[in-house]
Amino acid sequence: MKYIILIASLVIAFKASYADECIPTPHRTTGTHYEPVTIQKDNVSKGLVVRGQVLSMPDCQPVSAAKLAHWQAGEDGRYSDKLRAYLFTDDTGQFKFESEWPNLRPPHIHFIVTAEGYETLETQWLGTNRQNEIEFIMVLEVKGPE
């Protein structure tokens, strides 16, 4: 059930961003296979292009230099250090990396997104049918007063 809610929330955030009304991406657990991601790479494997954009709430503006740490299980259904890396968004808040299809049920990729002035986002992309390319938007919340 929680996976269905996340997919629906990501779709809502994606559609809302084009309506100039950003909804923050929901937070999801880092899972049991989290380990600190220490390698910066644009490509960790081949077969799946992952691209998207990081925007700010509530104005839907691109967030440049956001750090996206990602990890996932591979085609064999196992988590591996080779599929853990981080990268940064460009000046337009966009990111792109290549990986392999996450062969778990449901297929998913974990993300931790950090950017100066924004709350840290821990979330997951969830898929259904095998694809060669996926694209989505993540919306960050501005940090409140501490």
Residue ranges of predicted features:
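Sec-dependent N-terminal signal peptides
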Residues: 4-13
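Sec/Tat signal peptide C-region and signal peptidase I cleavage site
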Residues: 14-19
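Beta-strand-dominated extracellular/periplasmic modules and repeats
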Residues: 20-146
